[in-house]
From Swiss-Prot:
PANTHER family: ATP SYNTHASE SUBUNIT A, CHLOROPLASTIC. Key component of the proton channel; it plays a direct role in the translocation of protons across the membrane. Belongs to the ATPase A chain family. GO terms for cellular component: plasma membrane; proton-transporting ATP synthase complex. This is ATP synthase subunit a. It is a multi-pass membrane protein. Pfam families: ATP-synt_A (PF00119). Keywords: ATP synthesis, Cell membrane, CF(0), Hydrogen ion transport, Ion transport, Membrane, Transmembrane, Transmembrane helix, Transport. InterPro entries: ATP_syn_F0_a_bact/chloroplast (IPR045082), ATP_synth_F0_asu (IPR000568), F0_ATP_A_sf (IPR035908). One of its GO terms (biological process) is proton motive force-driven plasma membrane ATP synthesis.
Amino acid sequence: MEESINPIISIGPVIFNLTMLAMTLLIVGVIFVFIYWASRNMTLKPKGKQNVLEYVYDFVIGFTEPNIGSRYMKDYSLFFLCLFLFMVIANNLGLMTKIQTIDGTNWWSSPTANLQYDLTLSFLVILLTHIESVRRRGFKKSIKSFMSPVFVIPMNILEEFTNFLSLALRIFGNIFAGEVMTSLLLLLSHQAIYWYPVAFGANLAWTAFSVFISCIQAYVFTLLTSVYLGNKINIEEE
């Protein structure tokens, strides 16, 4: 399997991955269009497209509210809805098609199949939990809960690091492996004409399985984000 590269552009010391940037903008656009379309002309008794939006919304609230608590859920409900939709689409984009030039430049892939992208998402989640902890409880109380008692400071630092790393590596491993297997099956179909039916059937089954795994990973990522955030903002006052 030939190595693929993503096109990049440099602005001073900052390097932008054009494929990841384009995929991210596409995902944001799809989410915006979906929510705008489904929320137009909403009625008290939901029907049609409104049912779809409310079903997804209720599903996300159902597994995140126990971690956040009803007290804060209304402030974060739209965030978790958009995060879940973002991860579902991001995980499955690379399964739809593959756009790659002869020289190996890749113009279409799942952004979450890129380790740097996943590490960035994970870092933003951990950063958000600390920002919200300070905003909800104040800087002093947040620091105190993190550094008291003193002997648990190394354990707390290790916990934050492992949370950050596991959140990124879990989703990267699953999505990257899915795209690699899809590429291998496509290559198999090009080897000989008699391999085509086998490769087609295997690729169809693998794609269906990968979509399922991708949705599960979106669920897990959103769930863990709610757990980490809930742990930071729901600490009982001393």
